[in-house]
């Protein structure tokens, strides 16, 4: 989400400085989500390409984890099977999109669709912008499975590997796939949005990929997914609350059900990182600090509809204004993870580890202070057209 923020730079000893730009990009979940922190890689390639938008350019680092640490992940496969796979649900016990939608085989289908559309008419355009942005991000699921399979030591080496890491990745993907299916079909039936523009945006986004800067490291990767799943839980929970406020209890149920899945997935990913802190506290706190210095970028930050080069920033600004995902949420999530992993209580760290510990523990209040200053200076945002809603204009 976007805030108008005066540039401020804070220095942390031996750590890269971070700065808040005039208009920060607070990536919205799995949006994935980013912080109010500005990008440390300002270069932009503006050359138009047939299947991807202009994008930030930075040096891509690969395979940064020392090879010997791969053994850590092999050594805890038994633990993962017992403690991580339990957070998956058997398919026969999972909800499916059809459970929440008009039944096309029913004689009452037409009437059910009319009722859905009548409820949707009462919901404002800005809410639909956020709901569409969330759905598009969910629909880029092929990218997220690909990202998990870049991680050394835990990737699915065959496409049908029986290691618990590979089983988790495939089953997690299968569970997540229902989210996009459900939201996509709801939006199609609502009649409120331009489905062709939305579908183009999805194709552009999948074609563009993502680079969360996890460097093939499962340390960085699982810290990233821990943050993202909690951010998604927050975002879908807030869209549920707004839907209820607008009188659409069934849409609120849809968003709340998706949020519940995200919470369960968050639990699994945070348990993995908790285990890494137990086995390798120094390496894990260094990875945590590294990920936070680079900022948590949203998987959908390359969102593009063929028209608006700043589509993600515009979508994020609307979500920020509505309170669906905000700078405060970013700080709250970071503070939650610091507490969940008991980072402040770590002992026996190296000198670099202690500095990383101080950095991540001190970051949430620093973000909040800067956000409060930014809110004090915030100006009323402009209105921009969104192709997703037939170019109707929405205030940022």
UniProtKB/Swiss-Prot annotation:
Cofactors that this protein relies on: Fe(2+)
Compartment(s) of residence: Plastid, Chloroplast; Plastid
Recorded catalytic activity of this chain's protein: octadecanoyl-[ACP] + 2 reduced [2Fe-2S]-[ferredoxin] + O2 + 2 H(+) = (9Z)-octadecenoyl-[ACP] + 2 oxidized [2Fe-2S]-[ferredoxin] + 2 H2O
Major place of residence: plastid
Binding residues annotated for Fe cation 2, in chain numbering: 176, 229, 262, 265
GO biological process: fatty acid biosynthetic process
Subunit field text: Homodimer.
Protein name: Stearoyl-[acyl-carrier-protein] 9-desaturase, chloroplastic
Organism: Carthamus tinctorius
């Amino acid at each position: 989400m976007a805030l108008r923020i005066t540039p401020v730079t804070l220095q942390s000893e031996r750590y890269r400085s971070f700065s808040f730009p005039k208009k920060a990009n607070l990536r919205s979940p799995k949006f994935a989500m980013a912080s109010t922190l500005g990008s440390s890689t300002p270069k932009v390639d503006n050359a138009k390409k047939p299947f991807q938008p202009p994008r930030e350019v930075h040096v891509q680092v690969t395979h940064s984890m020392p090879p010997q640490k791969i053994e850590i992940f092999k050594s805890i496969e038994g633990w993962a099977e017992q403690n991580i796979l339990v957070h998956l649900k058997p398919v026969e016990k999972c909800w499916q999109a059809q459970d929440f939608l008009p039944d096309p085989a029913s004689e009452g289908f037409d009437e059910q669709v009319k009722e859905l559309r009548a409820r949707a008419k009462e919901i404002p355009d800005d809410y639909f912008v956020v709901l569409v942005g969330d759905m598009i991000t969910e629909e880029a699921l092929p990218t997220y499975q690909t990202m998990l399979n870049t991680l050394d030591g835990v990737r699915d080496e065959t496409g049908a590997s029986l290691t618990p890491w590979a089983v988790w990745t495939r089953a997690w993907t299968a569970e997540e796939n229902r989210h996009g299916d459900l939201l996509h079909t709801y939006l199609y039936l609502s009649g409120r949005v331009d489905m062709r523009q939305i579908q183009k945006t999805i194709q552009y986004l999948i074609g563009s990929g993502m680079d969360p800067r996890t460097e093939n490291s499962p340390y960085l990767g699982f810290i990233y997914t821990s943050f993202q799943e909690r951010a998604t839980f927050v975002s879908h929970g807030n869209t549920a609350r707004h839907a209820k406020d607008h009188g659409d209890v069934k849409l609120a149920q849809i968003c709340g059900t998706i949020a519940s899945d995200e919470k369960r997935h968050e639990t699994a990913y945070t348990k993995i990182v908790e285990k890494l802190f137990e086995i390798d506290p120094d390496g894990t706190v260094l990875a945590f600090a590294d990920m936070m210095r680079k900022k948590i970028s949203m998987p959908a930050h390359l969102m593009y509809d063929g028209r608006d080069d700043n589509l993600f920033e515009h979508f994020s600004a609307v979500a920020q204004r509505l309170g669906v995902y905000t700078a405060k949420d970013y700080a709250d999530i970071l503070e939650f993870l610091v507490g969940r992993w008991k980072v402040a209580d770590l002992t026996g760290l190296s000198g670099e580890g202690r500095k990383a510990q101080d950095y991540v523990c001190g970051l949430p209040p620093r973000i909040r202070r800067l956000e409060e200053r930014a809110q004090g200076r915030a100006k009323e945002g402009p209105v921009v057209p969104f192709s997703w809603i037939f170019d109707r204009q929405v205030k940022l």
